[in-house]
């Protein structure tokens, strides 16, 4: 691992939590003791509409002055969006957006930009969607290369969300400036083997984003039968040492696979304990302790069958 970062989405108000300005967030990450920051590349944080060269220079100085060196940019893309209207050049819009993010990354001294693939469109053949993503990532990587920046594909959106497909995708793009940003939480929630996936993707991965969860069952009451209908389980974000994802095993396997990148902590869904600034800070500080002190969470095998959301 090459540095522990805090993701600014954690303090963006995205799910009802307190909102910090980007400057306030930089100070928060530094005060908590993080090595760097992962910056949400949209309002209310690092929007390309608001950050030109002068603004980026000021922000970079603030990050440096607070003793942090590592920066990763969190982009937001969906290359399969609105395929039903090919007259609108959405793919071009997004590639141009990534090019602008590459400029921002260069100005901030960041080496990588997180990107997403696409959500499945039921009305469009899968192969067409896959090919659109491959060609888009390849062109985006060309643009990023002009600024000596790497784009990293996170396993977040529907397409290539499983580890094998993510590996296939990055290999098919076949570009030095397109890598993986493989996370453990998605395959863990899918009930997949995160250790074998980590060994397979470790060398291709430049950054990973971390959160831990506990799975809560859900039911709907059916008065007609005086009983309950089981619904898909709910993933509750919890402190790192209380979740079911075995991060010590994950990072060990990532290292065996060749991972040497950065790690960011995100609070991107409602937290156990509520949406207060104090609770956010407590979770973030707990992540640092968990990672730096090598805290290994106890494994409760009794709940093993509940780990998957399938």
Language-model features and meaning:
Residues 3-4, 8, 37, 135-244, ...:
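Acidic/histidine-rich catalytic cores of soluble enzymes
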Residues 13-20, 42-55, 81-84, 120-125, ...:
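Acidic-and-aromatic substrate-binding clefts and catalytic sites of carbohydrate-active enzymes
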Residues 122-137:
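Active-site cleft segment of glycoside hydrolase catalytic domains centered on the general acid/base Glu
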Residues 1-106, 110, 128, 138, ...:
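N-terminal pre-domain/capping segments
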Residues 250, 262-263:
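H/E-rich (His + Asp/Glu) clusters that bind or coordinate divalent metals
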Residues 105-126, 147-156:
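Active-site groove signature of glycoside hydrolases
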Residues 264-282:
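A short, acidic, flexible beta-alpha connecting loop/helix-capping segment that sits on the rim
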């Amino acid at each position: 691992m090459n540095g522990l970062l805090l993701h600014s989405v954690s303090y963006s108000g995205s799910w009802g939590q307190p909102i910090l300005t980007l400057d306030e967030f930089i100070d928060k990450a530094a005060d908590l003791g993080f090595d760097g920051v992962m910056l949400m590349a949209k309002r209310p944080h690092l929007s390309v509409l608001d950050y030109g060269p002068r603004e980026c220079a000021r922000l970079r100085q603030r990050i440096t002055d607070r003793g942090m060196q590592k920066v990763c940019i969190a982009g937001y893309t969906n290359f399969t969006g609105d395929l039903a209207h090919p007259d609108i050049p959405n793919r071009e819009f997004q590639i141009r957006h990534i090019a602008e993010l590459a400029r921002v990354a260069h100005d901030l001294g960041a080496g990588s930009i997180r990107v997403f693939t696409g959500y499945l469109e039921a009305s469009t053949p899968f192969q067409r969607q896959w090919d659109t993503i491959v060609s888009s990532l390849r062109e985006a990587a060309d643009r990023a290369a002009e600024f000596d920046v790497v784009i990293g594909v996170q396993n977040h959106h529907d397409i290539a969300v499983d580890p094998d497909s993510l590996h296939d995708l990055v290999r098919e793009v076949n570009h030095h400036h397109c890598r993986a940003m493989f996370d453990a939480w998605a395959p863990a929630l899918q009930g997949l083997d995160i250790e074998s996936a980590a060994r397979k993707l470790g060398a291709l991965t430049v950054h990973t984003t971390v959160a831990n969860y506990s799975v809560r069952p859900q039911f709907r009451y059916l008065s007609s039968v005086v009983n309950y209908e089981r619904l898909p389980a709910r993933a509750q974000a919890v402190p790192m040492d209380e979740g079911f994802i075995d991060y010590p095993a994950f990072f060990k396997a990532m290292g065996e696979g060749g991972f040497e990148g950065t790690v960011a902590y995100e609070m991107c869904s409602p937290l156990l304990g509520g949406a207060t600034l104090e609770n956010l800070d407590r979770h973030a500080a707990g992540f640092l302790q968990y990672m730096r002190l090598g805290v290994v969470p106890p494994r409760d095998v009794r709940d093993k069958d509940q780990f998957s959301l399938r």
